[in-house]
């Protein structure tokens, strides 16, 4: 079962966002929500934060709010399931060009970094493998292409980049949401 089956369809979500005048694509909204979850926001504060970032602090209408709750729940569930079900929410289908998908990916990554940044304000201080992945995501967010490029080659490259971004998001989730075990000698003594 894929995450796409648990959330509203991409076109349906796009319609809800357009009706509300949200100014974000479904990919960007999913990137933002994914970034907040991967950054460690796992309580109900995600909704007011999302409203602040995307709708001048105002709540969304019922249809969009319900669709976003489904998106948040499905994304959270997919990430908690060791990430096996987590997929980027990008447009698909015969009518979607590789260039549209590349643009959607860049938007997803930009908004993922925004969501991650608001939940992890010291993101620039992260080191190691996660720090490198975040730096790579910053570069991917500036993804560009030449429309004269071979579309088949670009599609193959894009699929590799999408998989890399997916794994980088899982790494961020693991880094910022998993409790680090404390060695017994480091734990504070319990007073009786």
From Swiss-Prot:
An example Gene Ontology CC term for this record: cytosol
Family indicated by similarity: Belongs to the UPF0149 family.
Disulfide pattern: none
Alphabetical list of SUPFAM superfamilies matching this protein: YgfB-like
HAMAP family per the UniProt record, alphabetical: UPF0149
Pfam assignment, any one: UPF0149
Gene it is expressed from: ygfB
Protein name: UPF0149 protein YgfB
Lineage top rank: taxon: Bacteria
């Amino acid at each position: 079962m894929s995450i796409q089956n648990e959330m509203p369809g991409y076109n349906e979500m796009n319609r809800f966002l357009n009706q509300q005048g949200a100014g974000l694509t479904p990919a960007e909204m999913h990137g933002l929500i994914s970034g907040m979850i991967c950054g460690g926001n796992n309580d109900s504060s995600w909704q007011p934060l999302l409203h602040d970032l995307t709708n001048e602090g105002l709540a969304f209408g019922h249809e969009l709010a319900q669709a976003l709750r489904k998106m948040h729940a499905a994304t959270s569930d997919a990430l908690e399931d060791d990430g096996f079900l987590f997929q980027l929410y990008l447009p698909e289908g015969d009518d979607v060009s590789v260039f549209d998908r590349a643009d959607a990916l860049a938007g997803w990554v930009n908004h993922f970094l925004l969501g991650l940044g608001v939940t992890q304000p010291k993101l620039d201080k992260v080191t190691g493998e996660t720090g490198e992945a975040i730096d790579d995501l910053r570069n991917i967010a500036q993804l560009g292409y030449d429309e004269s490029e071979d579309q088949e080659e670009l599609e193959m490259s894009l699929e590799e980049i999408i998989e890399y971004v997916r794994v980088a998001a899982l790494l961020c989730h693991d880094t910022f949401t998993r409790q680090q075990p404390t060695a017994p000698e480091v734990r504070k003594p319990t007073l009786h």
